[in-house]
Each structure stands twice: as structure tokens, then as C-alpha cells.
């Protein structure tokens, strides 16, 4: 059971992530459609994504591109830590940078492919350190990685963006 301590920033967790052509796309649960969100599709703020390649008919979902975060999301993240727990969340920094521009304090994600069981374990530890112990994101990422290590199948590591904050020790 995770409960935030008083004064602890909030966290947003996104499970499914895809990386392609130097962009990271966040999966939605909305099925891809030619009749919905036409402006967002035309401007490539929403793109079709799928979990696995398979032959037609296509049965994918909408994926949120970095421009969707910048122009279509309302409000600010007010220092929130955004956690991209799926594969490749920080393989490219375009989406992470968009969240920072919208006011997120930090973005945490994997630098490559990650198994479901490993990300579940790592993010559970990360949330414990962020919410139960009230650690800053940089320290929480370091502790979670010390607990679980890189993904045993893919070697990917949990990282924090922006790297300058991680290096300087700022939360």
C-alpha cells in the first residue's frame, strides 16, 4: 500500500510506451480510428500504435506523440514526476522534454526494452521510495536500480530526465 507523505509531489505512471524515428509514443486505450481526433491525427499528435506486429487487419490504438503533450494536454504538471514504465521511455528525449516543458519536475523511464516483470518490480520500488519514503526522484531512481539492477534480459536501465537534474542532485 503506497500513500504519499505530506509535502511529497505527485506521480503519473504510464505503462505502455513505443519508440520509433527518434520519438516516444505513449499508448492510449482508445482504438485507432479514421473518424476520431482528425485534427490531432493530421498534425501527427496522435499516431497509430500496436503492441506487436501482426498481419492486417490492423487492431491498434492511438499513441500520444510529444506534440500532443505540448499542444493538446491542458494545464501543467506542477513538479509532478512522470514515470514511463514501458519499453524505451527514455530511448529518445522528445516526449520527456515535452513533459518538462509542461511543468513536470522529472521524467523517469527505461533506456531500452524491458520485461514486464522487471519494470513492475522496479517501478514498485521506485514508487515506494518516492511516495512512502519521500525521496527526491534522482535518489529514488538510484535506490530502485540498486535494488533490482538492469533488466536481466535486455540490459536496460531506469533513468531520469533531465540528466542535468540527475547529475546535480536537484529533485
Regions found by a protein language model. Give the residues of each.
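Short, structured active-site "lid" loops
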Residues: 1
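Active-site-proximal C-terminal subdomain of hydrolase catalytic domains
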Residues: 80-171
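Domain-scale, conserved, charged regions that form catalytic cores
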Residues: 9-11
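Catalytic cores of nucleophile-dependent amide-cleaving enzymes
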Residues: 13-121
